[in-house]
UniProtKB/Swiss-Prot annotation:
One GO MF term attached to the UniProt entry: voltage-gated monoatomic anion channel activity
Spans within the Cytoplasmic topological domain: 1-21, 66-81, 108-120, 148-152
Transmembrane parts of this sequence: 22-31, 56-65, 82-91, 98-107, 121-130, 138-147, 153-162, 169-177
Name of the protein in its database record: Outer envelope pore protein 21, chloroplastic
Record's GO cellular component terms: chloroplast outer membrane; etioplast membrane; pore complex
Chief site of localization: plastid
Length: 177
């Protein structure tokens, strides 16, 4: 199980996040995620997805359900405590032969349980991985653009630490345990 501590500028509360992937077959797995808000002691998110990887296309597709009191980096729904159905897709294009620089397009759509409220997201990003940036230190830099919100974003990852920020001033920090 993967666990992390997360703190976002808009939440003012530390969250504990856990994720487990259970392999169904070679390229398919069942993924369960959950989050706990340490300020309220209540669940802040949860999801269950079936994800399939298409190795010939360097792409993934996921279908499942999710529950979020607050969706990704500060994007909120009108009513926050509904179950939502979700579809996710991602395609990676290597930019360099060594695979350290990639261009990725990704998208997703959530719909509430009554099929009345839709929320789409999608974007494109460049990712650059630098192994052994310094001794025992790997770094990843992502620069992208979220198309539906029309906002550029940045991610810097160093071993267990990840910092995310966007042009609207939203940010969060994650530490993987």
């Amino acid at each position: 199980m993967e666990t992390s501590l997360r703190y976002g500028g808009d939440s003012k509360a530390l969250k504990i996040h856990a994720k487990e992937k259970l392999r169904i077959d070679t390229n398919t797995f069942f993924q369960v995620r959950g989050g706990l808000d340490t300020k309220t002691g209540q669940p802040s998110s949860g999801s269950a997805l079936i994800r399939h990887f298409y190795p010939n296309f360097s792409a993934t597709l996921g279908v499942g359900v999710r529950y979020d009191k607050q969706d990704s980096v500060g994007v909120r729904y009108a009513k926050n405590d509904k179950l939502r159905y979700t579809v996710l897709a991602k395609k990676t294009f290597p930019v360099t032969n060594d695979g350290l620089v990639n261009f990725k397009i990704k998208g997703g759509c959530d719909v509430d349980q009554d099929f009345k409220e839709w929320k789409s997201r999608g974007g494109a990003e460049f990712s650059w991985n630098v192994f052994n940036f310094q001794k025992d230190q790997d770094v990843r830099l992502r620069i992208g653009y979220e198309a539906f919100e029309q906002v550029p974003y940045l991610q810097i990852r160093e071993n267990n630490w990840t910092f995310n920020a966007d042009y609207k001033g939203r940010w969060n920090v994650r530490y993987d345990l």
